[in-house]
A protein has these predicted regions:
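Hydrophobic faces of well-ordered beta-strands that scaffold small-molecule active sites
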Residues: 45-47, 91-93, 181, 210-212, ...
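Active-site clefts of carbohydrate-active enzymes
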Residues: 266-289, 325
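Conserved, mostly hydrophobic/aromatic
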Residues: 37, 47, 64, 84, ...
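The substrate-binding groove and active-site-proximal loops of carbohydrate-active enzymes
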Residues: 12-28, 60-74, 147-162, 179-188, ...
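N-terminal structural segment of carbohydrate-active enzymes
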Residues: 1-90, 105-109
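Active-site-proximal helices and loops of the catalytic beta/alpha 8
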Residues: 81-87, 99, 104-115, 170, ...
Length: 355
C-alpha cells in the first residue's frame, strides 16, 4: 500500500536485502492479499513481531500494546484479524518476551534512575555503574539477547514482569482476537512465567495456541502446563541432512523421523509446528537449487503429523540466503507468470492433501 508509506520507505523490489531497508509492507497489504492466501488453502498466518519497535526486524519492542506505525494501527490489525476469521484463517503473533528494546519504558527508567528505579528487578543487571555503556554485554554488566546492548533481557521470574506480560497477552486477545502466540527464544523464558501465563490465557480463550521457539528437545516445556507445541527444527534438520547434505542413509532418516515423533506426547505431535525454512534460516530453494528435491521435501512436510507451515514465497520457490536475505520482498508483480502459477498450483495441491 504505497499511499501509506513514509519518506524512509524504499521502493518495493526483488532481489537480495539487508537489515537496513524498509520496503513498506504493512497490515493493510496483508488484508488485501487474504483472498490470495485463502485460494492457496492457507488456514493460518504466523506474523513476525508487529508491535512498536525501532528496528526493521521488530524484535526490540518499545511498546507491547501498540501496533508499529510502519505496519498500521491497532484498528487495522483488528480489521485484518476479523476478515481473516471470516475466511477461516487464524492469526498467530510473535511475542518477544525474552528481551525488549532500549526504548521500552521500564528500561529507560532503569537507565535514568539506576538501582532506585521501580523497575530495577525487571532486568538482570550486574553492574549499575556501567549500565549505560555502549557495546556488547560480554563484560556481564547486564544480561541481554545475543550480547547486544540494544536488547536487555527481561527477568521473567519477577512476579511484576509476569503480571505485566499476562496483561499484554490478555489485551492482544480481547482487543485483536488473536488465535495463537509464538514465543521468541522460547527456551530462555522462565517456566514459572509460562505456567502462569497459560493458566491466565486459557481462562480467557480456551483454544489459544501457544508455540515455543525451541531448536532442540523441548520435552520439559511440553508437559501440558506451558506450550502446546514447538517449532520442529529437529525434523527440519533431519530432512535437510537426508535430501540435501546426503549425510543420512534411508534407515537413518526413518530413525530420525521416528525419534522426532517419540520425543513428545501424541497431543503435542498432533499440533507440532513443522517447517522447512523460516525468517531465521536460509530459504528452502536456496538450499536445494533443484526443484525436484524442493518438492520432495515439501511432500514429506505435508505428509507428516502436525501443522505444516510454509514461509511466504515458498509457493513460488522464492530464493534467499541466511538472515536477513531470507526476508526478501514478495515479488507480487511476477506472481501471475506462467512459471509461478504452475508452482503455486503444485503447492496448492499439497495443501489440499490436508483438507
Amino acid at each position: 500500500t504505497p499511499e501509506k508509506n513514509g519518506a524512509d520507505i524504499e521502493k518495493w523490489r526483488t532481489g537480495p536485502v539487508s537489515n537496513k531497508e524498509r520496503f513498506g509492507g504493512n497490515l493493510e497489504g496483508i488484508r488485501q492479499k487474504l483472498p490470495y492466501l485463502h485460494d492457496l488453502g492457507i488456514s493460518g498466518i504466523y506474523l513476525n513481531p508487529v508491535m512498536e519497535a525501532e528496528s526493521t526486524h521488530k524484535y526490540d519492542t518499545r511498546d507491547y500494546t501498540k501496533i508499529d506505525p510502519h505496519f498500521g494501527t491497532n484498528e487495522e490489525f483488528t480489521q485484518l484479524v476479523k476478515e481473516a476469521h471470516a475466511l477461516g484463517i487464524r492469526i498467530m503473533v510473535d511475542a518477544v518476551f525474552n528481551h525488549c528494546g532500549i526504548n521500552f519504558g521500564p528500561w529507560k527508567d532503569v537507565v535514568e534512575k539506576r538501582s532506585k528505579s521501580r523497575y530495577a528487578d525487571w532486568f538482570m543487571i550486574q553492574d549499575w555503574d556501567t549500565v549505560e555503556k555502549h557495546g556488547d554485554t560480554r563484560d556481564g554488566r547486564f544480561y541481554s539477547f545475543a550480547f547486544t546492548d540494544r536488547m536487555p533481557k527481561l527477568n521473567t521470574n519477577n512476579p511484576e514482569v509476569i503480571r505485566y506480560l499476562c496483561q499484554v497477552c490478555e489485551k492482544w486477545i480481547r482487543e485483536f482476537d488473536i488465535d495463537g502466540i509464538r514465543f521468541d527464544v522460547g527456551n530462555e523464558i522462565s517456566h514459572c512465567f509460562l505456567k502462569e501465563l497459560r493458566r491466565h490465557l486459557r481462562s480467557i480463550k480456551p483454544d489459544l495456541y501457544l508455540l515455543g521457539e525451541i531448536w532442540h528437545d523441548a520435552s520439559q516445556w511440553l508437559q501440558g502446563d506451558e506450550y502446546d507445541s514447538v517449532m520442529n527444527y529437529p525434523l527440519t534438520s533431519g530432512i535437510q541432512d537426508f535430501f540435501l547434505d546426503r549425510t543420512m542413509e534411508k534407515d537413518e532418516f526413518e530413525y530420525m523421523v521416528n525419534r522426532c515423533y517419540t520425543m513428545y506426547m501424541q497431543q503435542n505431535n498432533n499440533v507440532i509446528f513443522n517447517l522447512l525454512d523460516s525468517h531465521d534460516t536460509e530459504r528452502l530453494m536456496n538450499k536445494c537449487r533443484d526443484l525436484d528435491i524442493f518438492y520432495q521435501q515439501l511432500a514429506v512436510l505435508f505428509t507428516m503429523p502436525g501443522s505444516p507451515c510454509i514461509y511466504y514465497g515458498t509457493e513460488i520457490a522464492l530464493e534467499g540466503a541466511h538472515d536477513p536475505d531470507c526476508r526478501r520482498c514478495m515479488p507480487w508483480d511476477e506472481i501471475d507468470s506462467d512459471e509461478n502459477q504452475e508452482r503455486i498450483a503444485l503447492v496448492r495441491s499439497l495443501i489440499h492433501l490436508r483438507m
